[in-house]
């Protein structure tokens, strides 16, 4: 049995001023193909297959997508995903999608065997959403744990069947991460000497198959810290972050003599009282007696 862990998809947004010639050193020169989507007026593709969306509204920045094929080609030159992750971090890129793949090759483990373990209630996972896709010849060939509309879900599938390699055993576990999860994971992976333990830990924390000896062996090295994020930002904090705080910051500039932070603290206290919570010392952003 052989196992491999790697990044299999990476979508990143850079600031509008990002010099795309910097990434061309890795993926080759970009050629404009036409108009982009989602408000971008330019879509370009590099020699290696990287896709760039640019020239939209300034707040949109520039969007770069590296597919599994592009990343595989980069690994043959750079030897790992580390240099690309370092580049993204150095240039303040913000990941919007990150796929972490674990390949288990030439083993007896199959999507069907792991699905049976999951159906028997023996897999450990915090999500109840799932979907299985069946092939008449091999039973379950692909299944998903978690909603495909969420920020994180696991896809388990027969990679050999996908690649039409019938004589080979090749199982892939693919953890698809989006938005805040993707951004947090990329930031954490930059700090790792090797990303393989991080991939193992990220997968097993989301869904573990303890009865499969081959799965346990493939994910045995998992001594990495994986950040835990809230599933959804509460509406109150989203309102504070997107509307109240920017407005108060603008008011502080306009009226420097006014104690805007004190006003913000009082608003926070009212929110706690509305929820029926007793105020504690740590709940105060600023002592309201000032």
What do the PLM-derived regions correspond to, one by one?
Residues 1-231, 239-290:
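Structured, helix-rich domain cores that form ligand/interaction pockets
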């Amino acid at each position: 049995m052989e196992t491999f862990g790697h990044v299999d998809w990476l979508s990143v947004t850079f600031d509008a001023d990002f010099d795309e010639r910097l990434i061309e050193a890795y993926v080759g020169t970009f050629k404009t193909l036409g108009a982009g989507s989602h408000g971008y007026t330019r879509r370009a593709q590099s020699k290696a297959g990287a896709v760039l969306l640019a020239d939209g509204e300034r707040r949109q920045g520039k969007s770069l997508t590296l597919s599994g094929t592009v990343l595989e080609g980069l690994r043959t030159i750079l030897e790992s995903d580390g240099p690309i992750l370092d580049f993204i971090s150095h240039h303040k890129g913000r990941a919007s999608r990150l796929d972490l793949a674990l390949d288990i090759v030439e083993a007896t483990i199959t999507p069907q065997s792991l699905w049976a373990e999951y159906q028997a209630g023996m897999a450990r996972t915090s999500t109840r959403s799932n979907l299985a896709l069946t092939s008449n010849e091999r039973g379950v060939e692909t299944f998903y744990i978690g909603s495909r509309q969420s920020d994180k879900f696991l896809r388990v599938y027969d990679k050999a069947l996908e690649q039409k390699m019938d004589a080979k055993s090749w199982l892939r576990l693919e953890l698809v991460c989006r938005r805040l999860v993707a951004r947090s994971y990329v930031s954490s992976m930059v700090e790792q000497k090797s990303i393989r333990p991080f991939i193992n830990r990220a997968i097993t924390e989301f869904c573990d198959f303890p009865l499969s000896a081959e799965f346990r062996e493939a994910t045995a090295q998992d001594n990495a810290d994986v950040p835990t994020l809230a599933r959804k930002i509460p509406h109150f904090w989203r309102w504070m972050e997107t509307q109240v705080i920017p407005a108060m910051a603008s008011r502080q500039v306009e009226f420097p003599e006014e104690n805007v932070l004190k006003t913000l603290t009082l608003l926070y206290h009212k929110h706690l009282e509305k929820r029926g919570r007793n105020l504690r010392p740590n709940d105060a952003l600023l002592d309201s007696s000032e």
